[in-house]
């Protein structure tokens, strides 16, 4: 054990600890210690290797690391490979940007093989960057052998899963509407669509009813470009629709509009007058045929038999009639399936109209809005704009379209019920994340489109014969090599595209062009990280995962994709427990964005305050499942907390080193806390109390950690450090550290501080691994494990927990706060003693606590006596105050006289009479409780303050003896400050002189009693106290200072003895 002189410097401390971990290979050695423990299989949700980590990524990994460190200290053998998502559009778009590409054509021209290699290089480079950033956060995962979705063995895990889907009849080729990015020219998942406000046209259009002159169905849309694909109009059977004769500019039209919306629509169309001809139920309109207003521009529209259909989702807004284009909307597509409508989709992969769109061919669809509107001519009833939330590609930010295309699907709807049953078997943190949020999402989920029309991803392992149409799904690379007779060195595009499988018909099977949705990559992580299906041993022993945790958006992402793939492959969930955490936002609850200028990076926090502060802060700020609203002031609060921890740790070391203190060890030189257990009954109250408190802390944190209430644990730890340890126990025990002679009291103090710090650093280790390691490294005994992270999680020692003592100490702390307030009111500093402190209470608990801990109360109050009085204290007088709102109405003209009588009365006697009899006679008038209130009239020099269930009274009146002690304490404080300025060791003796410019004060502190007290406290081998008229003393000292001590001028000089 060494003395620590340096202040808390987190960056220097953490760099040193991480260097030690690296040099000593500490992580691997900790794993070795736990290798025989019960396995705990954790699957790391893989971040995309697209750049540097952000605050949300850091928070995510910190949560994971904290929980895994906790379980490791609980004896578990943690299986914890880091993982990285290294395929997909996130990587492709980054590489395209680097190469200056804007379209798939650019990639084709560049060469798929060359582009793939660029993607591979980018992904691996950024994986290494991110791994280093995670290491800097103190994250202990297996970064030397992470699972990588680009590896051949990982790709096989995905191939095997889709082969299982084929075997179970859960894989199909379908023509459906999907989210489509026209820039990336691929389908994208619902979870990959980002929404923000966008302004679009808002138009009302008249569709002419077949066979009825000047009669129209009025629809509304914000996507005019979808009108060339219109095939139907939907109405609600629950609504009433009006057939209206509307007049404008001398002509009349017959319009069909939802009855409640007639006036708003006609007003928008600037009609002057109207008459309702009839009202019908929506179901009566079903089957009505109409013509396309664009039949002249889009030839195919003339071939479609347009009609009205019923739909429950139609809302009573705009016109109450909805334009249906099954090729451009999911709900429309479902109606089309139900009604047998054509899914007409004259739009290509790049978002341009095809030749089937007639006059609009080759135009980008969203650019065509104005032309479509112009082509409507007189069929346009009204045109406005609307600002609404619209979907965009998550990677390139292009506005998406909905497009009917041929894709590969997993039939998630057929396994929906098994998935819901599996959700109920999983332990969710918090519970509602599974039972409500995730359950509802899965309940409403659609079949999963697993195909993408891109390059850098896991190739879908489906080979299809061009002649007979037969298809086969390959499960492993070995199977592919066997079936094809060709070697497959890299299962990526374009290499795997060249592999041909002979078909039984005599033809050739070629691989379909698509790659997997990147979400399917990570969906198989729980078995891919175990090497399955190549290797079975680890899978059979460990799968499914014991625990995973990711952000709340992963209910639509990774939580779901894993559940879907695993239910397809194994019929069960791939995880046993899931923690869902929130989003990292700014202080105002907004998403962090460069455009807002509100981004805070982990590096910013780490560089200013250190890794442990960042770690502790993000765990302390809120419950894991709530959003983190980052706040710099709170970060500073945590920095102060760890700084206080460091100072508490430093505080006893000089005394321990000076006294050659060796903590009592157990068998093999291992510290086991046995000294405290063996001597607890002989130890002072404050020692027994802090020992009880740290064990109570261990008990509560154990329960909270089981439920992953990380915020409760960190807040309890912070409160213990600040309130229990620093602001209370250290203040109580400090004088015992200064004792010159060896004594049981000093030994108890040393052993207690050591015991508490050893327990505390073990509790802190998962949260602040660096400072815990640093403190432990200096405190550990020869037989102790080499790292704090090799220790077992501290269990509460129930024999050392004293609930009654903890309750009593809370009373004393409340008393201490009240004394401080009363002294402040009386302008008497705590260093100055007072004659008497009285506590008036009706609480037996307060009375018992202050009597049992009276010595402690006396010391804290710096009072000659501390008395507890039940009832009333006889020195308290009462001042009577009239209540005029009661006196006026009852006494009328006599009111002023009654008022004067009450004000002049003996308030104490009047209060006693009313309390005794319910009334009192005063000058011939009957005074009741309603007529008067009473205020305390404290004796001169007595000041009061409330505490819980009591009132504290402090008499600050000074006597010569009290004044002498007060001045002596002031002198001691000044000399101690001067010792610090001279940087003296705690055991250095000094010589000192105190020259006082006041005869009376000089004579008070020159008394032998106080000279000895001062000399003893400041370790003065020689001390002179004398009267001075302001002249400088003739001696010279190493340090001389003038002080104003409560208005008295003093000159103090000190030097190290012997110099």
UniProtKB/Swiss-Prot annotation:
The organism's place on the tree of life at top rank: Archaea
Reactions that this protein is recorded to catalyse: tRNA(Ile) + L-isoleucine + ATP = L-isoleucyl-tRNA(Ile) + AMP + diphosphate
Domain notes: IleRS has two distinct active sites: one for aminoacylation and one for editing. The misactivated valine is translocated from the active site to the editing site, which sterically excludes the correctly activated isoleucine. The single editing site contains two valyl binding pockets, one specific for each substrate (Val-AMP or Val-tRNA(Ile)).
Reported function: Catalyzes the attachment of isoleucine to tRNA(Ile). As IleRS can inadvertently accommodate and process structurally similar amino acids such as valine, to avoid such errors it has two additional distinct tRNA(Ile)-dependent editing activities. One activity is designated as 'pretransfer' editing and involves the hydrolysis of activated Val-AMP. The other activity is designated 'posttransfer' editing and involves deacylation of mischarged Val-tRNA(Ile).
Motif range ('HIGH' region): 47-57
Organism of origin: Methanoculleus marisnigri (strain ATCC 35101 / DSM 1498 / JR1)
Gene Ontology molecular function: any one: aminoacyl-tRNA deacylase activity
Cofactor(s) for this UniProt protein: Zn(2+)
Compartments in which it is found: Cytoplasm
EC number: 6.1.1.5
Assembly mode: Monomer.
BP terms from Gene Ontology: isoleucyl-tRNA aminoacylation
Ranges spanned by the short sequence motif 'KMSKS' region, renumbered to the chain: 591-595
Identification of the protein by name: Isoleucine--tRNA ligase
Positions annotated to bind ATP: 594
UniProt keyword annotations, A-Z: Aminoacyl-tRNA synthetase, ATP-binding, Cytoplasm, Ligase, Metal-binding, Nucleotide-binding, Protein biosynthesis, Zinc
Recorded family membership: Belongs to the class-I aminoacyl-tRNA synthetase family. IleS type 2 subfamily.
GO cellular component: cytoplasm
Any single Pfam family the record assigns to this protein: DUF5915
Major localization class: cytoplasm
Enzyme class: ligase
InterPro entries named among the record's database cross-references: aa-tRNA-synth_I_CS, aa-tRNA-synth_Ia, Anticodon_Ile_ABEc, Ile-tRNA-ligase, Ile-tRNA-ligase_type2, M/V/L/I-tRNA-synth_anticd-bd, Rossmann-like_a/b/a_fold, tRNAsynth_Ia_anticodon-bd
């Amino acid at each position: 054990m060494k003395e620590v002189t340096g202040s808390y410097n987190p960056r220097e401390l953490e760099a040193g600890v991480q260097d030690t971990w690296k040099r000593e290979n500490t992580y691997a050695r900790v794993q070795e210690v736990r290798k025989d423990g019960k396995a705990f299989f954790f699957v790391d949700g893989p971040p995309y290797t697209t750049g540097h980590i952000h605050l949300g990524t850091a928070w995510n990994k910190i949560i994971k690391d904290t929980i895994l460190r906790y379980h490791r200290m609980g004896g578990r053998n943690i299986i914890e490979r880091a993982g990285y998502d290294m395929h997909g559009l996130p990587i492709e778009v980054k590489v395209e940007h680097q190469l200056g590409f804007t379209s798939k054509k650019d990639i084709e021209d560049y060469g798929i093989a060359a582009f793939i290699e660029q993607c591979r290089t980018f992904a691996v480079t950024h994986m290494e960057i991110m791994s280093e950033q995670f290491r800097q956060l103190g994250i202990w995962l297996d970064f030397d052998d992470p699972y990588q979705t680009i590896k051949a063995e990982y790709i096989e895990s995905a191939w095997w899963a889709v082969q299982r889907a084929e075997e179970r009849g859960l894989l199909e080729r379908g023509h459906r509407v999907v989210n489509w990015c026209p820039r990336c020219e691929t389908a994208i998942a619902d979870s990959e669509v980002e929404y923000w406000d966008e302004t679009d046209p808002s138009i009302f259009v008249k569709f002419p009813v077949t066979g009825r002159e000047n009669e129209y169905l009025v629809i509304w849309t914000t996507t005019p470009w979808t009108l060339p694909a219109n095939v139907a109009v939907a109405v609600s059977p629950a609504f009433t629709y009006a057939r209206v004769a509307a007049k404008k500019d001398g002509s009349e039209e017959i319009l069909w509009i939802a009855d409640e919306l007639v006036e708003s629509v006609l007003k928008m169309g600037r009609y002057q007058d109207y008459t309702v001809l009839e009202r019908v139920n929506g179901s009566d309109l079903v089957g009505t045929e109409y013509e396309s207003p664009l039949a002249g521009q889009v030839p195919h529209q003339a071939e479609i038999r347009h009609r009205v259909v019923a739909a429950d989702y139609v809302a009573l807004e705009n016109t109450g009639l909805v334009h249906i284009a099954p090729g451009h909307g999911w709900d429309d597509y479902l109606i089309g399936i139900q009604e047998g409508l054509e899914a007409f989709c004259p739009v290509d992969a790049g978002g341009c109209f095809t030749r089937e769109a007639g006059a609009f061919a080759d135009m980008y669809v969203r650019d065509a809005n104005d032309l479509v509107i112009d082509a409507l001519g007189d069929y346009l009833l009204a045109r406005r704009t609307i600002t609404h939330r619209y979907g965009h590609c998550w990677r390139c930010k292009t506005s998406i379209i909905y497009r009917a295309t041929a894709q590969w699907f997993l039939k998630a709807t057929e396994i929906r019920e098994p998935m819901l049953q599996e959700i109920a078997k999983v332990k969710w943190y918090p519970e509602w994340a599974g039972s409500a949020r995730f359950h509802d999402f899965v309940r409403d989920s659609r079949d999963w489109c697993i195909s993408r029309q891109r390059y850098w991803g896991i190739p879908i392992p489906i080979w299809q014969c061009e002649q007979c149409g037969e298809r086969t799904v390959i499960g492993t690379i070995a199977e592919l090599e066997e079936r094809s007779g060709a070697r497959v060195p890299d299962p990526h595009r374009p290499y795997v595209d060249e592999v041909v499988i002979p078909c039984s018909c005599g033809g050739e099977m070629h691989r379909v062009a698509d790659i997997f949705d990147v979400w399917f990559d990570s969906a198989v992580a729980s078995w891919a990280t175990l090497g399955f299906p190549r290797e079975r041993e680890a899978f059979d022993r460990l799968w499914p995962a014991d625990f995973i945790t990711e952000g709340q958006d992963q209910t639509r992402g990774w939580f779901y994709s894993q559940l879907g793939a695993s239910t397809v492959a194994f019929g069960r969930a791939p995880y046993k427990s899931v923690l869902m955490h929130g989003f990292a936002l700014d202080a105002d609850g907004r998403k962090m964005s460069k455009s807002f200028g509100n981004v805070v990076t982990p590096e910013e926090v780490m560089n200013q305050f250190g890794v442990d502060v960042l770690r502790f802060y993000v765990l302390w700020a809120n419950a894991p499942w709530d959003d983190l609203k980052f706040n710099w002031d709170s970060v500073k609060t945590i920095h102060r907390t760890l700084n206080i921890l460091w100072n508490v740790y430093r505080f006893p070391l000089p005394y321990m080193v000076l006294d050659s203190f060796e903590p009592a060890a157990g068998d093999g030189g291992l510290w086991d806390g046995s000294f405290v257990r063996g001597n607890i009954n002989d130890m002072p109250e404050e020692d027994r109390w802090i020992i009880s408190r740290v064990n109570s802390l261990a008990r509560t944190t154990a329960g909270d950690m089981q439920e992953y209430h990380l915020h409760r644990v960190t807040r309890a730890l912070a409160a213990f450090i600040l309130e229990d340890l620093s602001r209370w126990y250290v203040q109580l025990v400090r004088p015992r550290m200064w004792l010159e002679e060896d004594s049981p009291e000093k030994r108890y103090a040393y052993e207690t501080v050591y015991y508490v710090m050893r327990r505390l650093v073990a509790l802190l280790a998962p949260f602040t691994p660096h400072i815990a390691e640093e403190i432990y490294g200096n405190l550990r005994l020869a037989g102790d494990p080499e790292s704090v992270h090799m220790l077992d999680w501290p269990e509460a020692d129930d024999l050392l927990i004293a609930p009654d003592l903890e309750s009593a100490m809370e009373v004393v702390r409340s008393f201490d706060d009240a004394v401080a307030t009363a002294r402040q009111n009386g302008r008497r500093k705590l260093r100055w003693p007072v004659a008497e402190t009285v506590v008036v209470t009706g609480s037996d608990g307060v009375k018992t606590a202050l009597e049992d801990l009276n010595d402690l109360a006396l010391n804290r109050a710096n009072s000659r006596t501390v008395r507890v009085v039940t009832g009333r204290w006889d020195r308290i007088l009462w001042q009577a105050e009239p209540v005029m709102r009661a006196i006026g109405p009852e006494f009328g003209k006599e009111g002023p006289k009654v008022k004067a009588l009450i004000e002049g009365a003996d308030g104490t006697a009047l209060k006693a009479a009313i309390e005794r009899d319910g009334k009192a006679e005063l000058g011939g008038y009957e005074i009741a409780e309603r007529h008067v209130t009473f205020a305390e009239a404290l004796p001169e020099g007595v000041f009061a303050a409330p505490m819980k269930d009591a009132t504290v009274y402090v008499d600050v009146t000074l006597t010569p003896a009290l004044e002498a002690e007060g001045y002596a304490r002031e002198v001691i404080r000044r000399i101690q400050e001067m010792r610090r300025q001279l940087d003296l060791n705690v055991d250095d003796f000094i010589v000192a002189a105190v020259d006082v410019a006041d005869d009376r004060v000089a004579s008070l502190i020159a008394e032998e009693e106080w000279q000895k007290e001062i000399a003893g406290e400041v370790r003065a081998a020689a001390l002179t106290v004398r009267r001075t008229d302001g002249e400088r003393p003739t001696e010279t000292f190493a340090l001389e200072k003038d002080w104003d001590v409560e208005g008295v001028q003093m000159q103090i000089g000190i030097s190290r003895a012997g110099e």
